[in-house]
């Protein structure tokens, strides 16, 4: 971004991938207004998220109705909608498009039988998924890596098998090769003495916005869990952050 800061420039793309923004940027070059280009981007992300979720859940369940239900549940998740329509967290809701592909990759890993080779055609989805996370929202990428670590510990007997480890190592290798052009400058800048590496005190914010386990399945909003930024912000007063009771019913039925 050479035009930022009165012509001094600011390399924001090094720390925050913007590959997904080429679509609205192209619309802008074609004469579409900024507002309409952004609306088109949101529409594309919503359609893409629904389609990717449907594909992943169809591969997992093998049933079209189950896949459609899972896609609706994921696409209409309160937090995802809040990221779009309340917080305008573009990087975050863009990254959510790729998360079902990560889930699918570990489904492939877990269902593989002992010494059964996991075919090459099952590499595309996870590589695209991890690449999408890296290129859209690095924080989501780190959070996903943390959850994968916990997942691998829980299912260590099924993960630490020769065929599964070979499959996962190929995913890691291909993902790194595809994203080295982004990862190397990112790590170089992280090693510099910039403000982005400084420690910030987040305790009050965590206590204000955090949710305990019981609140994760709340149906209605309260003063802690919603995105209320003013008395007149009516939509944010009605946007809860928990996963909702629908997910609780799904888990109970499972």
What are these regions (language model features)?
Residues 65, 116-118, 157-168, 254:
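Membrane-interface helix-loop-helix junctions at transmembrane boundaries of multi-pass membrane enzymes
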Residues 105-114, 150-160, 254:
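Structural signal for the C-terminal ends of transmembrane alpha-helices
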Residues 44-48, 72, 97, 101, ...:
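Generic alpha-helical transmembrane segments of integral inner-membrane proteins
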């Amino acid at each position: 971004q050479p035009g930022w800061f009165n012509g001094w420039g600011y390399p924001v793309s090094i720390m925050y991938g913007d590959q997904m923004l080429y679509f609205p940027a192209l619309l802008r070059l074609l004469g579409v207004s900024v507002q309409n280009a952004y609306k088109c981007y949101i529409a594309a992300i919503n359609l893409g998220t629904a389609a990717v979720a449907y594909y992943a859940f169809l591969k997992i369940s093998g049933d079209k109705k189950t896949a459609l239900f899972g896609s609706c549940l994921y696409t209409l998740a309160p937090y995802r909608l809040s990221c779009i329509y309340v917080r305008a967290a573009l990087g975050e809701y863009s990254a959510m498009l790729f998360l079902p592909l990560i889930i699918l990759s570990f489904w492939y890993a877990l269902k593989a039988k002992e010494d059964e080779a996991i075919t090459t055609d099952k590499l595309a989805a996870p590589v695209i998924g991890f690449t999408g996370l890296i290129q859209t929202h690095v924080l989501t990428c780190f959070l996903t890596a943390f959850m994968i670590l916990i997942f691998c510990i829980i299912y260590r007997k099924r993960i630490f098998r020769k065929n599964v480890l070979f499959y996962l190592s190929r995913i890691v290798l291909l993902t790194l090769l595809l994203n080295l052009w982004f990862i190397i400058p990112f790590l170089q800048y992280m090693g510099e003495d910039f403000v982005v590496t400084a420690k910030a005190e987040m305790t009050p914010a965590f206590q204000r916005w955090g949710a305990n386990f019981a609140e994760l399945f709340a149906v209605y909003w309260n003063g802690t869990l919603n995105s209320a930024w003013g008395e007149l912000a009516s939509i944010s007063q009605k946007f809860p952050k928990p996963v909702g009771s629908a997910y609780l019913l799904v888990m109970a039925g499972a």
